[in-house]
Amino acid sequence: MPQDKLRIATRRSPLAMWQAEHVAAELRRHHPGLEVELVPMVTRGDRILDQALSRIGGKGLFIKELEQGMEEGRADLAVHSMKDVPWRMPDGFALPVILERHEPTDAFVSNHYRRLDDLPEGGHLGTASLRRQCQAKARRPDLRVSTLRGNVNTRLAKLDAGEFDAIILAASGLSRLGFDERIARRLPPEESLPAVGQGALGIECLAEDRRVQELVAPLDHGPTHTLLKAERAMNARLQGSCQVPIAGYACYQGEEIWLRGLVGSPDGQEIVRGEVRGPIAQAAELGDRLGGELLERGAARILADLAD
């Protein structure tokens, strides 16, 4: 492999390609003369679109093939949406860089309604996320919620075809693809607490590849990396996956980190919420502490029920 070239493994979806191109542009900006090549791959999560992610193995399905590509020497790094990255990294891989977070919020998208509360009785809502389903059903138990898979363009097309009254997507994905005008309302964390890592991109590479780690290091955004340490530590304590409705969102409040988290049942009937504040230097400890508090207050039982 030439020292002046990097190959980025990426999924083929428009959003994944945008994210990889964004990282490629940043790498070229920091390293003039560096050749950056995209290596598109199809993952199992992209191929199986007729089932909910929670039924076929979770978000790790979107990254395993990319990791295999790095192991086999076909790529040097991979770019991921951090909300898709499991809390436990596989042996032999590192996550050295987290780029500056875009917006972390969920977006309510509808052609006829401005907000969730405006949907008619028994309205049809589409989402691919148990976390979003849980919080929407808690607010509107009457809604019919169905699994909505596929890339952003596919999901919008299903809404436009009348299959749903509204859908909920990540605001960052819509914005990155130029679909800001489709957002009826950005949902504040108080209404729809984001997924762990939502809105941030991460770079994964082989743990032993010092060359790649040095080249990507300038792209790391320390403040975002610290916040995600808190969120991911909470998720690690909960041993969360996308089979479980878990949300976690950290932000800065003065000189402290404010971390909010929740664990719920898919039907929204049970939700355990919690929050902690503490020193920035203790980000991981704060996340671990909040995870423990949620477990003690009922999350352990919810998680056990979902595992059965």
From Swiss-Prot:
MF GO annotations: hydroxymethylbilane synthase activity
Modified residues (S-(dipyrrolylmethanemethyl)cysteine): C242
Keywords from the named record: Porphyrin biosynthesis, Transferase
One GO term describing the cellular component: cytoplasm
Annotated GO biological process: protoporphyrinogen IX biosynthetic process
Tagged with keyword Nuclease: no
Pathway(s): Porphyrin-containing compound metabolism; protoporphyrin-IX biosynthesis; coproporphyrinogen-III from 5-aminolevulinate: step 2/4
Presence of the UniProt keyword RNA-binding in the record: no
Cofactor note: Binds 1 dipyrromethane group covalently.
PROSITE patterns, per database record: PORPHOBILINOGEN_DEAM
SUPFAM superfamilies: Periplasmic binding protein-like II, Porphobilinogen deaminase (hydroxymethylbilane synthase), C-terminal domain
Top EC class, one word: transferase
InterPro entries: HemC, Porphobilin_deaminase_cofac_BS, Porphobilin_deaminase_N, Porphobilinogen_deaminase_C, Porphobilinogen_deaminase_C_sf
Domain of life: Bacteria
Catalytic function, reaction form: 4 porphobilinogen + H2O = hydroxymethylbilane + 4 NH4(+)
Subunit structure of this chain's protein: Monomer.
Role description: Tetrapolymerization of the monopyrrole PBG into the hydroxymethylbilane pre-uroporphyrinogen in several discrete steps.
Note: The porphobilinogen subunits are added to the dipyrromethane group.
NCBIfam families associated with the record: hemC
HAMAP family (UniProt xref): Porphobil_deam
Protein name: Porphobilinogen deaminase
Annotated organism of origin: Alkalilimnicola ehrlichii (strain ATCC BAA-1101 / DSM 17681 / MLHE-1)
